[in-house]
Amino acid sequence: GRNYAEHAIEMGHDPSKEPPFFFQKNPDNIVTDGKFPYPSQSSDVHHEIEMVVALAKGGDNIPVETALEHVFGYGVGLDMTRRDLQGEAKKAGRPWEVGKAFEASAPCGPLVPASEIGHPTSGAVTLKVNGEMRQQGDLNQLIWKVPEMISYLSGLFTLQPGDIIMTGTPAGVGAVVRGDVMEGFVEGIGKIEVVVV
């Protein structure tokens, strides 16, 4: 979390480089059918557009210098967030999973192999809702780069082939309602279109 400075600021945090904050979604949170069912437990669900990294091989204590050798490819994803429940968890000093790791909370587009596109380090990251631009950033604004994220994470957990890492979202997060159409794009990787149902 908080891997783009402007998003850190809009969420009330200091954007200076600090160890990244990670949370885990469940494997069944990932959906690819282009639909996001609005969760009944929340009244304030936000979009967060992100580049996702898919691992081809796992490991632990992976050096930064060899981290990219573990990457299969990249995709476009949405980290849908029950902002109201996340806020309550933060105030209580509890983990964020109640706001982040719920059913269908991680819509993802197709994965593109790194063997085809390399390892993107720059390129536009955008999200439109009903045709209106909401989020705009660039991969070159990532505070923690992909090799650093993989290395750091692998020091905390043993990573597995098939693991998906969401890399953070640029500024402009906001609420969606049923009927909204979200169009996410990461330059050089692809796009995703998701309807809130």
Q: What would you call each of these model-derived segments?
A:
Residues 2-71:
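Extended, compositionally biased flexible segments
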Residues 3, 7-17, 75, 83-197:
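Catalytic-pocket segment enriched in acidic/His residues
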